[in-house]
């Protein structure tokens, strides 16, 4: 095996993922979330609630399912609902051991059937006797005999109660469950979560459906003695969160009709047991939308866990990613196994997507999508194993919407020349930004400086949504401009345009781009348009690290730029694949004067400006 590939695979030697053992228990399949796994294990033993907060695709739902497997084995129960003769609108609830519920219902049905058969036999015997008596005594009155028989049948239907009305309904059936129940109630409406009573269109005349037969269990009741999982818990209404809190506290919750206009609203069962463990999940914004009392309940009687987005790039963790690929193949069941070179490419992609030096991404759902796409390509080509070329093809196909939009963005901007890739321009810079979380774009920035229209102070005038970001960046830049150029911009209006602004561009990574454009506009020094740049900026002129440098560099390459300036602290975060390697010169910088040195056009103005920088730096030393 190639030594580089062996190193990427963490020292593992295998021919394909078929040789890699996949753990049977779900909890052992969780990768890179050691803290969360430990919390889940403790919560399962002690029956505590858990809240998992983190990015999508980091294993929250998998941990919740794993918890159901870990719960101590105890006697599961079936829940039956019976009619209440004293108050038909308050059906009775009864608990029996798992499996007994079906037996009881079948026994009641059998008994009801026997009674119905006996009743029907008596009624039809009576009907034949009436008709027979009429024919024998007075054949001319046969029609009246038939009418009498029909009346007897109708009266028996309306006035003799049906035997099946007393048959109980099996509300929760756990007869086929070996482990504790797991209920995913993500996105469930109130009726699906707390139970409901169906509407009865025929409410009289003997045609009505008994109240207990219309009762439907909710997810909280089906999760009795198991796990209730709710992702994006903040999407629940406050009213639903209050009900959920009541169910958590009382461990039982009655079922009633959820719609005021339904006849089911009049029905309210006895409290139905719902002794479940709640596993709530969501992103950081989920905390803002949670009912304070509900969060307090989880915090006081359970664990709060923040999921990792990345894990250290160590041989042990790379071995875990090898196992992850094997797990995905086994779970999917429709794609071939991967050879070692294909797995190595998946691990390289995990490094690239981490966006952080010496780390591997833990957004494994997205990485799993790449695995499945590569498997589909191999399958369509008739290959019995996934090879390196299949993964490389998959990387081009399995692009996110943001990446596809970024490709179209760059393509269209090229057509209309919205960004320039050669020559020199005053006050114009090719900045770099990220759309979403995985797609880079070139963001042309144009600055113009004019005398202030206000007698009191100058203004920062920027486009649309980027007004706030631009203002903040310029305020930081103003200190640098005053210090190094000797100009006071308080009596100037600074106009900044983000050309072809794309929705979703955020952050201050355009700070050095704005600073360069403004300094170029003030000093009248042209900027090299073959250079793109990204980086945050301190008021002291230090270039600070930013996120998504790999994606931004790839966007610069795609746009046809020759150089890219990035913060020096980000140099180890650059993980270009073979397709982009060596196609652009990457220049790491640590101060704004280094940026200007690389991008401003040579000449007297530049020399004069750079000499000011040197003088001030020497004075500071």
Curated annotation (Swiss-Prot):
| Active site: residue positions | 509, 552
Q: Which residues lie on this side of the membrane: Cytoplasmic?
A: 1-117, 161-621
What SMART domains would the database entry show?
AAA
InterPro entries listed in its UniProt record: AAA+_ATPase, Lon_arc, Lon_proteolytic, Lon_Prtase, LonB_AAA-LID, Mg_chelatse_chII-like_cat_dom, P-loop_NTPase, Ribosomal_Su5_D2-typ_SF
The protein's topology relative to the membrane is: Multi-pass membrane protein
Annotated binding of ATP, by residue = 54-61
Give an example GO cellular component term for this record: plasma membrane
Q: What is the effect of changing residue 506 to A?
A: Slightly decreases proteolytic activity
List locations, semicolon-separated: Cell membrane
Q: Name one GO molecular function term.
A: ATP binding
Top-level enzyme category: hydrolase
Q: Which PROSITE patterns match?
A: LON_PROTEOLYTIC
Keywords, ordered alphabetically: ATP-binding, Cell membrane, Hydrolase, Membrane, Nucleotide-binding, Protease, Serine protease, Transmembrane, Transmembrane helix
Q: What is its EC number?
A: 3.4.21.-
Membrane-crossing ranges are 118-136, 142-160
| Biological processes annotated in GO | protein catabolic process; proteolysis; regulation of DNA-templated transcription
Q: How does it assemble?
A: Homohexamer. Organized in a ring with a central cavity.
Its biological purpose: ATP-dependent serine protease that mediates the selective degradation of mutant and abnormal proteins as well as certain short-lived regulatory proteins. Degrades polypeptides processively.
Q: Identify its protein family.
A: Belongs to the peptidase S16 family. Archaeal LonB subfamily.
NCBIfam families linked? lon_rel
**Name this protein carries in UniProt:** Archaeal Lon protease
């Amino acid at each position: 095996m190639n030594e580089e590939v062996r190193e990427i695979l963490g020292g593992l030697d295998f021919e394909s993922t078929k040789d890699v053992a996949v753990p049977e228990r779900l909890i052992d399949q969780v990768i890179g979330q050691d803290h969360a796994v430990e919390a889940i294990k403790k919560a399962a033993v002690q029956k505590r609630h858990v809240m998992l907060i983190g990015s999508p695709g980091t294993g929250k739902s998998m941990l919740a399912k794993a918890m159901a497997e870990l719960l101590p084995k105890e006697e599961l129960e079936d829940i039956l609902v019976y009619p209440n003769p004293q108050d038909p609108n308050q059906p009775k609830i009864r608990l029996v051991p798992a499996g007994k519920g079906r037996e009881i219902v079948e026994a009641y049905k059998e008994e009801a059937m026997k009674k119905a058969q006996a009743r029907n036999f008596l009624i039809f015997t009576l009907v034949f006797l009436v008709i027979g008596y009429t024919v024998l005594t007075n054949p001319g009155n046969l029609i009246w005999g038939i009418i009498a028989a029909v009346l007897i049948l109708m009266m028996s239907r309306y006035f003799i109660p049906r035997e099946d009305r007393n048959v109980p309904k099996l509300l929760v059936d756990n007869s086929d469950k070996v482990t504790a129940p797991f209920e995913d109630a993500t996105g469930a409406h109130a009726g699906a979560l707390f139970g409901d009573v169906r509407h009865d269109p025929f409410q009289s005349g003997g045609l009505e459906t008994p109240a207990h037969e219309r009762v439907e269990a909710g997810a909280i009741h089906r999760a009795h003695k198991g796990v209730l999982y709710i992702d994006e818990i903040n999407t629940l209404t406050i009213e639903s969160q209050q009900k959920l809190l009541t169910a958590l506290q009382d461990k039982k919750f009655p079922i009633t009709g959820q719609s005021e206009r339904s006849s089911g609203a009049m029905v309210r069962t006895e409290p139905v047991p719902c002794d479940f463990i709640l596993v709530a999940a969501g992103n950081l914004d989920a905390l803002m939308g949670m009912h304070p009392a509900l969060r307090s309940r989880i915090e006081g009687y359970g664990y709060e866990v923040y999921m990792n987005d990345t894990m250290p790039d160590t041989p042990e963790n790379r071995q875990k990613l090898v196992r992850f690929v094997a797990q995905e193949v086994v779970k999917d069941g429709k794609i071939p196994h991967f050879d070692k070179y294909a797995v190595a490419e998946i691990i390289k992609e995990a490094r690239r997507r981490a966006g952080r030096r010496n780390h591997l991404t833990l957004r494994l759902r997205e990485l799993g999508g790449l695995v499945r796409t590569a498997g589909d390509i191999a399958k369509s080509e008739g290959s019995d194993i996934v090879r390196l070329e299949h993964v490389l093809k998959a990387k081009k196909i399995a692009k996110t919407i943001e990446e596809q939009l970024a490709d179209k963005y760059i393509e269209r901007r090229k057509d209309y020349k919205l960004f320039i890739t050669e020559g020199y321009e005053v006050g114009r810079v090719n900045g770099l930004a990220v759309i979403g979380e995985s797609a880079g774009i070139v963001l042309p920035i144009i600055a113009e400086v004019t005398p202030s229209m206000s007698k009191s102070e100058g203004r920062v005038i920027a486009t649309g949504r980027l007004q706030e970001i631009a203002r903040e960046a310029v305020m930081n830049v103003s200190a640098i401009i005053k210090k190094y150029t000797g100009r006071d911009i308080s009596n100037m209006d600074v106009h900044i345009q983000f050309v072809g602004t794309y929705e979703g561009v955020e952050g201050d990574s355009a700070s050095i781009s704005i600073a360069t454009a403004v300094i170029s506009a003030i000093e009248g020094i042209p900027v090299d348009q073959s250079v793109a740049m990204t980086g945050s900026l301190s008021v002291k002129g230090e270039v600070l690290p930013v996120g998504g440098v790999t994606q931004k560099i790839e966007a610069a390459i795609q746009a046809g730029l020759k150089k890219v300036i990035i913060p020096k602290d980000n140099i180890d975060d650059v993980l270009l694949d073979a397709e982009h390697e060596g196609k652009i010169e990457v220049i790491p910088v640590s101060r704004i004067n280094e940026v200007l040195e690389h991008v401003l056009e040579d000449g007297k103005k530049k020399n004069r400006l750079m000499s000011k920088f040197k003088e001030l730096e020497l004075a500071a030393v």
